[in-house]
């Protein structure tokens, strides 16, 4: 079969590999749709110290069950499923409390298991054991269902923020994740949602797709002055950094109201050190939260919101590419007007 494989030394190669076969407790799916995540983009551009090669990457996935191994799974061939990629051990302190995404022995599809940028993928037995395999209603299009995991990650990021009608929300980053955070903030009843970026094309597209938000191009406008005027000099109550720029963490401290809640959602380079103002946190009584991945329960909630139409997430998909043209998709994502791309089965390639 065709697969996109991380071979080490910052190299990803489209190559033919053996089709996986089911083992005890596992299942094989034919990938119907996989989505390119920011993590995949970083691996494409810079490699990854987390991935032990060779490894098929890609972790946002839905597919059709082809084969089921012996021992435990109730799935049947022909069923549609999505797979939650972050798989806990089920036994550690955090797993026992439902926080499987911060498991002490977390293993992730596309990093520790072969992932979704392939024609077929094996679902690990531990994914079944942890409830990470979710049956899909055939009425939900795969192109929407595959976005469940990133929506669940945003739900996790906002789970500690308690956004409500009295809150102004500032989001750094107008990429796909920033736009999804904005959708959730609007749905939570925030009185105003401000999306800031330095990419004018992305901001324009975000504004076209969500008329309930405000946008600020901070390369041309004074974001501090905008926030001051918008909040009567009080500052914003909720800030989400949905971009890999550590300086936004420092700016968040400056633009926050007293007792604001801040989610550091996007990972940053340089080991993430040296961006926080400890005195600002102390004197303004700021609550600063991290966010990593999502649990199976959060994925089920995300899928419910997609299925019900509460969150219109598929509108942020700019298009799709067949697997045999996946590198074109990665290059296309450099365009400011491209927010999210899907990878579909290859054209004219026999399994």
PLM region spans:
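Glycine-rich beta-strand-centered segment in the early N-terminal region that forms part
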Residues: 18-34, 47-96, 101, 134-137
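NAD(P)H dinucleotide-binding glycine-rich loop of Rossmann-like/cofactor-binding domains
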Residues: 91-172
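Mid-domain Rossmann-like dinucleotide-binding core that forms the NAD(H)/NADP(H) cofactor-binding site
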Residues: 138-220
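Glycine-rich phosphate-binding loop and adjacent beta-alpha segment
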Residues: 190, 245-308, 345-351
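Short amphipathic alpha-helix with an adjacent loop that forms part of the alpha/beta core around
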Residues: 222-232
């Amino acid at each position: 079969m065709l697969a996109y494989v991380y071979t080490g030394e910052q190299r990803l190669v489209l190559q033919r590999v053996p089709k996986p076969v089911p083992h005890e407790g596992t299942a094989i799916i034919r990938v119907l749709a996989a989505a390119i995540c920011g993590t995949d983009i970083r691996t494409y551009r810079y490699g990854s110290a987390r991935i032990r090669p060779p490894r098929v990457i890609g972790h946002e996935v839905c597919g059709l069950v082809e084969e089921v191994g012996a021992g435990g799974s109730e799935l049947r061939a022909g069923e549609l499923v999505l797979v939650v990629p972050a798989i806990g051990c089920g036994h550690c302190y955090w797993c026992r409390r439902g926080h499987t995404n911060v498991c002490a022995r977390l293993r992730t599809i596309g990093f520790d298991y072969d992932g979704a940028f392939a024609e077929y993928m094996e679902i690990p037995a531990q994914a079944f054991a942890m409830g990470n395999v979710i049956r899909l209603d055939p009425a939900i299009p795969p192109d929407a269902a595959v976005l469940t995991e990133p929506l669940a990650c945003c739900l996790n990021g906002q789970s500690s923020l308690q956004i409500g009608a009295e809150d102004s929300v500032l989001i750094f980053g107008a990429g796909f994740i920033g736009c999804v955070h904005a959708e959730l903030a609007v749905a939570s009843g925030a009185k105003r949602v401000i999306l800031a970026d330095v990419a004018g094309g992305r901001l324009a597209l975000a504004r076209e797709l969500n008329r309930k938000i405000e946008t600020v191009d901070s390369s041309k406008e004074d974001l501090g002055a905008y926030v001051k005027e918008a909040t009567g000099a009080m500052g914003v109550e909720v800030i989400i950094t949905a971009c890999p720029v550590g300086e936004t963490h420092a700016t968040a401290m400056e633009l926050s109201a007293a007792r604001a809640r801040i989610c550091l959602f996007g990972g940053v380079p340089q080991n993430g050190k040296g961006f926080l103002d400890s005195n600002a946190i102390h004197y303004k009584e700021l609550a600063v939260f991290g966010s990593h991945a999502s649990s199976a329960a959060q994925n089920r909630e995300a899928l419910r919101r997609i299925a019900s139409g509460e969150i219109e997430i598929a509108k942020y998909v700019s298009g799709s590419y067949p697997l045999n043209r996946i590198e074109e998709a990665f290059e296309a994502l450099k365009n400011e007007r491209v927010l999210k791309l899907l990878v579909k089965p290859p054209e004219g390639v026999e399994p």
